[in-house]
Amino acid sequence: MDLFSPAKLNLFLKLHGKTSHGFHEMTTQYQVIDFGDNLYLESSNEDSLVCNLPELNTPQNLIWKSLQVFRDYTQIRSPVAWRLHKRIPIGAGVGGGSSNAATALYALNEHFQTQLPNSVLQELGKKIGMDVPLFFSSGSAIGVGCGEKILPYKDCKREERFVLYFSDQGVLTKDAFSYVRSEDFSQREENISLYKKENDLEKSVFRFRRDLEEKKQMLKKMWSPFHAHVCMSGAGATLFVSYPRKLEIDPSIAKAIHATIQNSQGVLVNSLRKHSGWFPCPDNLFATTR
């Protein structure tokens, strides 16, 4: 079984305070995108995991946690072999590890024909990581609580395109949250549409990653002719640009946009939704422009 394991963006992320357990409460808009990894699953004589990034061939890989959670719930112990082809950078803030974990849960459910509904898979996903339940939604959702409570959201941003800018150095989630100050918190809004397209974690991350702050300012200047918006996803280190798809109707503007993407080494992506089953695999995962 070969499944696409997509990345996600946080189109906005607002922090509201801390829980009694020390976790940060938030409201965030998630969007799954057509860029990601591939995960292969097959029966085997013993459990194994092989990844094209050797540093992920460890017991700490969340795929192993998914397998354990699935086994605890179903009592199925048959050994399986995994192969993971990574494209999503480590520590990028676009849900690479969480997506792999969710994809693994879905794959196990299909492989062993256990017919667990999405509601159960979401609950199992919460035991693995805060972002994992997202991937059992349609791909467009609002996250509340600590981000793990998923609410459906129809606005899938098909009228926008996104350009990803990865960093050579990732950001650890624990570091991003450790620099948060009380003045970084935002008030809750009654209507989701009232939230500005901002990521409150930028304030904390930029305190120890000035290079990302400088990169954001550079991207804002570069993309200003196209009325584009620049934001950090999750805890970083990925920055992304969003711009109106309708701009590409004009051939000259479309040409200028694609030249900007190529010159800045961005990765052009689109929103991705599923209507049933799992997320479809895009035709071309390697091109920087499509």
Swiss-Prot record:
<feature type="binding site">
    <location>
        <begin position="89"/>
        <end position="99"/>
    </location>
    <ligand>
        <name>ATP</name>
    </ligand>
</feature>
<dbReference type="InterPro" id="IPR006204">
    <property type="entry name" value="GHMP_kinase_N_dom"/>
</dbReference>
<protein>
    <recommendedName>
        <fullName>4-diphosphocytidyl-2-C-methyl-D-erythritol kinase</fullName>
        <ecNumber>2.7.1.148</ecNumber>
    </recommendedName>
</protein>
<dbReference type="GO" id="GO:0005524">
    <property type="term" value="F:ATP binding"/>
</dbReference>
<dbReference type="GO" id="GO:0019288">
    <property type="term" value="P:isopentenyl diphosphate biosynthetic process, methylerythritol 4-phosphate pathway"/>
</dbReference>
<feature type="active site">
    <location>
        <position position="131"/>
    </location>
</feature>
<dbReference type="GO" id="GO:0016114">
    <property type="term" value="P:terpenoid biosynthetic process"/>
</dbReference>
<feature type="active site">
    <location>
        <position position="8"/>
    </location>
</feature>
<keyword id="KW-0418">Kinase</keyword>
<dbReference type="InterPro" id="IPR014721">
    <property type="entry name" value="Ribsml_uS5_D2-typ_fold_subgr"/>
</dbReference>
<keyword id="KW-0547">Nucleotide-binding</keyword>
<dbReference type="Pfam" id="PF00288">
    <property type="entry name" value="GHMP_kinases_N"/>
</dbReference>
<dbReference type="InterPro" id="IPR036554">
    <property type="entry name" value="GHMP_kinase_C_sf"/>
</dbReference>
<dbReference type="InterPro" id="IPR020568">
    <property type="entry name" value="Ribosomal_Su5_D2-typ_SF"/>
</dbReference>
<comment type="pathway">
    <text>Isoprenoid biosynthesis; isopentenyl diphosphate biosynthesis via DXP pathway; isopentenyl diphosphate from 1-deoxy-D-xylulose 5-phosphate: step 3/6.</text>
</comment>
<keyword id="KW-0414">Isoprene biosynthesis</keyword>
<keyword id="KW-0808">Transferase</keyword>
<comment type="similarity">
    <text>Belongs to the GHMP kinase family. IspE subfamily.</text>
</comment>
<dbReference type="GO" id="GO:0050515">
    <property type="term" value="F:4-(cytidine 5'-diphospho)-2-C-methyl-D-erythritol kinase activity"/>
</dbReference>
<keyword id="KW-0067">ATP-binding</keyword>
<dbReference type="InterPro" id="IPR004424">
    <property type="entry name" value="IspE"/>
</dbReference>
<comment type="function">
    <text>Catalyzes the phosphorylation of the position 2 hydroxy group of 4-diphosphocytidyl-2C-methyl-D-erythritol.</text>
</comment>
